[in-house]
């Protein structure tokens, strides 16, 4: 008869930018956890929240919640143990809102602007 009765469905990912925004939202609301060991077991039985915002007690993180086990190093400050030299004294781009810009690179500490004039002989011929 020339007609087709078969349908094919497949799953697709959302746009990459949407995934990035969702991960960033989860990153900013991530919770510090620590493993809780049962007395009879050697491995952790669950993770408990160390800090519950706005309330007391502990709770088990949900399967979709982003958690972390230790604080990230502060890359603004020098920390030899973490291998970070910090950002103090580094040149930055005052007009850039991106990673090399002064506002981000200087971690909100402010920055000094230096204007330098350099003269040299160009060996020009007229």
Curated annotation (Swiss-Prot):
Transmembrane domains' residue ranges: none
Molecular-function GO term, any one: cytokine activity
Subcellular location: Secreted, Extracellular space, Extracellular matrix
Lipid attachment site numbers (O-palmitoleoyl serine): 1
Signal peptide bounds: none
GO cellular component: extracellular space
PTM comment: Palmitoleoylation is required for efficient binding to frizzled receptors. Depalmitoleoylation leads to Wnt signaling pathway inhibition.
Pfam families: wnt
GO biological process, one term: neuron differentiation
Disulfide bridges in this chain: 92-107
Main location: secreted
Glycosylation sites: 93
Keywords, ordered alphabetically: Developmental protein, Disulfide bond, Extracellular matrix, Glycoprotein, Lipoprotein, Secreted, Wnt signaling pathway
Job description of the protein: Ligand for members of the frizzled family of seven transmembrane receptors. Probable developmental protein. May be a signaling molecule which affects the development of discrete regions of tissues. Is likely to signal over only few cell diameters.
Family: Belongs to the Wnt family.
Stated name of the protein: Protein Wnt-7(II)
Gene from which the chain derives: WNT-7(II)
């Amino acid at each position: 008869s020339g007609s087709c009765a078969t349908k094919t469905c497949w799953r697709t990912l959302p746009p990459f930018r949407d995934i990035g925004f969702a991960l960033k939202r989860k990153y900013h609301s991530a919770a510090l956890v620590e493993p809780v060991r049962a007395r009879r077991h050697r491995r952790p039985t669950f993770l408990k929240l160390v800090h519950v915002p706005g309330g007391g007690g502990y709770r088990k993180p949900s399967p979709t919640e982003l958690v972390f086990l230790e604080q990230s190093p502060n890359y603004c400050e020098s920390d030899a143990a973490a291998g970070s030299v910090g950002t103090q004294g580094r040149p930055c781009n005052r007009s850039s809102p991106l990673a090399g810009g002064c506002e981000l690179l200087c971690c909100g500490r402010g920055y000094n602007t230096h204007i330098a004039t350099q003269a040299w002989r160009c060996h020009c011929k007229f």
